[in-house]
A protein has these predicted regions:
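Polar-ligand-bearing catalytic/cofactor-coordination segments
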Residues: 3-295, 306
Length: 306
């Protein structure tokens, strides 16, 4: 009983504000530490890279990273603003009243409410996306995104986010209505399961909506990669090249999916600028976390969200 009384006496609004404030403070502190570290070494190419990177390229790299870090802090501010606007600002209550005036169905109401929230969030985040793509990325010569691609991406994101989020809301409301006082256990399990399914299907259903993926056929890259994968006993469903040049000149390689659906993806921009030996080194860097089972860590945010 004492525990129950203690729980009932907790001011959850205060806890909510403290949690959000603490999270933002820690993240911002770490970003400022990175900013200060970059500034301390600004203008001085590290000795081990003096024969690889010239001072002009190094300055461009540091300036770009500083701009990105400052932008990330701004994004954190905006995210908190949207969250507080929805909760403490009363926007969520206002939207709920609108939904109640449209339908008496709890499930349909949850779907409409989720859709309204996504629409508002997307609209508020558009200026940030524009600044990131057409100001920062453009400034440093990385942007290749056309206005048409930018708008198309927003529409696709909106549709996909709406379908996934509204489906989750409908499932949770259905569980609340039908499974009694222990609904939260079943809701947690359902949300977590849906997220794992999405994580599994993401590389084969969602990613192809935004980019084209072709099998890696270049033998000078493919052979050393397959040899390295065999050495570390990493089983991938395939090696793919993504048309990242549609949006950016950045080069990258990454893993996606899990279980029997793991894939290795290379940006086409990366293959255009490196040698097979360099590719093997890059992939070795990416494979490192596999040896320490870091690929299972994405499930932690899923648990937190659930």
């Amino acid at each position: 009983m004492e525990i129950l009384n203690t729980i009932e006496s907790i001011n959850f609004t205060t806890l909510f504000i403290l949690f959000i404030g603490l999270k933002f403070t820690i993240e911002t502190y770490l970003k400022y530490r990175n900013i200060n570290s970059i500034k301390q070494n600004e203008g001085r190419v590290p000795k081990r890279f003096e024969n690889i990177v010239n001072s002009e390229e190094y300055k461009k790299s540091t300036d770009y990273n500083l701009d990105r870090l400052k932008f990330q802090i701004l994004v954190s501010f905006v995210s908190i603003f949207i969250l507080l606007l929805l909760t403490l600002g009363g926007l969520l209550s206002w939207l709920t009243q609108i939904v109640l005036g449209i339908t008496s169905s709890n499930i349909l109401g949850a779907i409409l409410l989720g859709f309204f929230i996504i629409i508002i969030s997307e609209i508020l985040e558009i200026p940030l996306a524009i600044y990131s793509t057409f100001v920062i990325e453009e400034k440093y010569g990385f942007n290749k995104t056309t206005k048409k691609t930018f708008v198309t991406d927003i529409i696709k994101n909106l549709i996909i986010s709406s379908v996934i989020s509204c489906s989750i809301y409908a499932v949770v409301i259905g569980i609340i209505e039908n499974l009694g006082s222990n609904w939260w256990i079943f809701a947690f399990g359902a949300v977590f399961s849906i997220q794992l399914i999405i994580f599994f299907l993401y590389p084969v259903l969602i990613m192809p909506l935004f980019n084209k993926f072709e099998p890696l056929d270049d033998e000078q890259f493919k052979k050393p990669i397959e040899k390295l994968l065999e050495k570390v006993k990493f089983k991938a469903k395939g090696l793919f090249v993504m048309n990242a040049s549609l949006r950016s000149s950045h080069g990258n390689a990454f893993f996606t999916g899990f279980g029997n659906n793991k894939r290795i993806v290379f940006y086409d921009t990366l293959l255009e600028t490196i040698t097979p030996d360099e590719m093997e080194a890059i992939l070795g860097h990416e494979l490192g976390p596999v040896s320490y089972t870091h690929l299972s860590l994405p499930t932690i945010p899923q648990v937190e969200f659930s």
